Amino acid sequence: MIMERGSANLVYVDESGFEPSVGRLHGWSLRGQKVHGEQAGNRRPRQSLIAARRGKDFLAPLLFFGTTNTAWVHRWMAQMLFKELRPNSTLIFDNAAFHNKSDLEAIAHQHGHHILFLPPYSPDLNPIEHDFANLKRQRQFAPPETALAEIIKCYGNYTE
């Protein structure tokens, strides 16, 4: 399928969750003394990001509070992703439980696109995983008052 359509129309799709606060991994102290720090013990609502990657383009990032489910993925595809795709694109998804294969294939075919699913437990085959790792790293070193949406906007072409 990839040989027929070419790699320029391959679009990798994934989602990632972001905790509200990020603890520091390192600190400074006098030699031989422990570093003490505080970290919130209560849980706050996490944010989720759904996005796609085509080549070097970061497509249709959607940031929202809560966790990703089937309804979020379908809504995101219909309202954001399809507007940014080239005709006859191939969407590549992982095997998350909420990626209902038959539903996704039907929605994609209605818009003239195709779906492929990665083998289970193969994040190394999905290049957008590197984007999520980079975003989390940038967030970790950003000033605490920096909104996650601002980090994503700087990283790609994020629009609310």
Language-model segments: residues:
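Short functional hotspots at interaction and active-site rims
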Residues: M1-E160
